[in-house]
C-alpha cells in the first residue's frame, strides 16, 4: 500500500532448491555475485546463505533449532547447524529482530560487534468491510477459510492443523481441503 520499489533484477537458479542450499552450505558455490554481476552486498534473509566473496548480511529470525532440536528433522538440524557455522565464520553483519534473538546469536558464537537488532516492522492500516467484500468478490472467495502456510517439518505442527480440520469437518461436513 503506497510502496514502490525500484526495478530489481531477478535470477533463478537451475539447481533445485535443496541441491542449491546444500551446495551453498558445503561448497560455498555458486557465488551470488556470479548470478547478478555488479552486486555490492549479499543479504541472506533466511538460513539459506549463498556463497559469496562480497560483504554478507544475514538476518537470523531465531535459533529455535538450538533450543528445541526435537521440533526439527535430523536433516533440518544438520542444515541449520551448518548454516550457523557459515554465519559465524563469514557474515559481516547479522540482523536479529529482537534483543532476545541477538543474545541467542552471541550465545551461539557470533561476535557481538556484528549483531544488530533491527525489529521486524510493518505498517498496517484498518481495512473496511467494503474493501474486504470487494476483495472477496474479486477473487471469488465466498466462503470461510482457514489458511495454513509453512514448510513441512515437525515444528510447524501440520498434523495438529489436520487434526483440527477433522474436528471442524465433523461439525461442518461441507468443509473441504483445497490445494
Model regions: which residues?
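Carbohydrate transferase catalytic cores enriched for Leloir-type hexosyltransferases
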Residues: 1-179
